[in-house]
Amino acid sequence: MTSLKLLKEKAPLVICITNDVVKNFTANGLVALGASPAMSEFPADLEDLLKYAGGLLINIGTLTDENWKLYQAALKIAEKYNVPAVLDPVACGAGEYRKKVADDLINNYKLAAIRGNAGEIASLVGIDVASKGVDSAGVDNIDEIALAANEKFNIPIVVTGEVDAIAVNGEVVTIHNGSAMMPKVIGTGCLLGAVVASFIGLEKGQELKSLETAMLVYNIAGEMAEKRPNGHLPGTFKVEFINALYEITDEDVKKFKRVK
């Protein structure tokens, strides 16, 4: 099984093209975990960096026409160097323009995984689910949404919510770990996309196990952070979550994981 120890040993360079709100939080989270983030947004620089990268994150949160072109350029370069790319289609269910961009990136470029909340992923496959931009209401059929997207796009899918679902090659697992504090801190979902990009390329052909490990590490770190003094307060939780990502071990994952 793909392990946190393996990630720390490889310390993959992860290129994060993400939204302006979360860049600092994302970079610090990846460093704490053991990956090496680069927040580059210049195509010529990306050509140099992606030669050595272990993963690429495309997060469409701060969407502009210029950024759309940047996403396309980055994905072309990533495919050239066989770098696994993860798409976070932020708020793609909130409007036609975002949906158009997400559809373009999914249909015309090579992706290793898509990570989104239930509302975002449901919108990609035409399932009607209540969604509020980057947030999504509690959804009972999250595993069905993940499977529908996996079957439609033939791409590994991670759907997040009160329960998380991972679908790869028609197989679905659900993750029942996590903290209720996560949605109260802006950027936790976006950082998760970067964590997925850190794990997805560690072991070829082991995408399901890699994604499962990524989700467990992330969610159990959230549980650890919430249990610490004042972890029920969002400001403290944010700091303690970074600390927990730094301290969590494979033994913690084995002890506390809840997978179905």
UniProtKB/Swiss-Prot annotation:
CDD domains reported in the protein's UniProt record: THZ_kinase
Pathway per the UniProt entry: Cofactor biosynthesis; thiamine diphosphate biosynthesis; 4-methyl-5-(2-phosphoethyl)-thiazole from 5-(2-hydroxyethyl)-4-methylthiazole: step 1/1
Catalytic activity: 5-(2-hydroxyethyl)-4-methylthiazole + ATP = 4-methyl-5-(2-phosphooxyethyl)-thiazole + ADP + H(+)
Keyword annotations from UniProtKB, A to Z: ATP-binding, Kinase, Magnesium, Metal-binding, Nucleotide-binding, Thiamine biosynthesis, Transferase
Annotated residues for binding of substrate: 39, 187
Molecular function as annotated in GO: ATP binding; hydroxyethylthiazole kinase activity; magnesium ion binding
Record function comment: Catalyzes the phosphorylation of the hydroxyl group of 4-methyl-5-beta-hydroxyethylthiazole (THZ).
Residues holding ATP: 115, 160
The UniProt record lists the keyword Kinase: yes
Essential cofactor(s): Mg(2+)
InterPro entries per record: Hyethyz_kinase (IPR000417), Ribokinase-like (IPR029056)
Sequence similarity: Belongs to the Thz kinase family.
Enzyme Commission number: 2.7.1.50
GO terms of biological process kind: thiamine biosynthetic process; thiamine diphosphate biosynthetic process
Protein name: Hydroxyethylthiazole kinase 1
Domain of life: Bacteria
SUPFAM superfamilies: Ribokinase-like
